[in-house]
Amino acid sequence: LRRQRQMCIRDRMSGTCISEEMMRTMRSSMLFLPAILSRAGSATVCYPGGCDIGLRPIDLHLSALRLLGARVTEDGCCMHCTAPGGLVGCPIHLPFPSVGATECVMLAACTAKGVTTLMNAAREPEIGDLADFLNAVGGKVLVDGNGTVTVEGVSSLQGTAHTVIPDRIVASTYMSAAAITGGKLLLRQVRTAHLAPVLPVFQEMGCDLRRDGTDLLITAPERLRAFKRLTTMPYPGSVSYTHLR
């Protein structure tokens, strides 16, 4: 139930299957799989879409779920997952600090039996925000900030009110628009700490950045300077969000 800038999510479930039409609209729809699986013991979803960057496999997500005890059957474009005996916590080491795979493990492990220790986890601000939310609903999640996430499974979760952190990718996109048009733009409710990997890039191109609390004013020159080198890296490397390229 959506009201203006708020969304109310009720705890009723009408099924454990999400249609291909819905899954194809958004890459992050993949996160419904661990959420439904951990609650209902089974889930059927199709491969997610919604990303124009190119092929982005979900093998890390599925491998992690299998380690937690899920049985995953792939049939064409769909995946059917079951956990007959429930999910069980275990140590998991990601070969790459994938944001989606990290979130997948956190959601699945929240009500799994025992403790899950996720190593080489993503360090994006959204990981900390998800941990804050899960803890608010009764979970036991610890993010150490250095790539390790520890989740102690609980028997049940509860409702809560949570404010999502400002979207750093949207903010960076607006900043890019201001830069290429030689304009001036005031962004409100920005967490500049989350933008730390990209702010030096805008400054190197000649943009003037002024911060005032949660406000960020960017003023672009008539002609941008070329930056010497730009490489995408896992957060908090520079530049750490591939979407911004």
Residue ranges and their predicted role:
Residues 3-245:
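Structural preference for solvent-exposed beta-strand-turn elements
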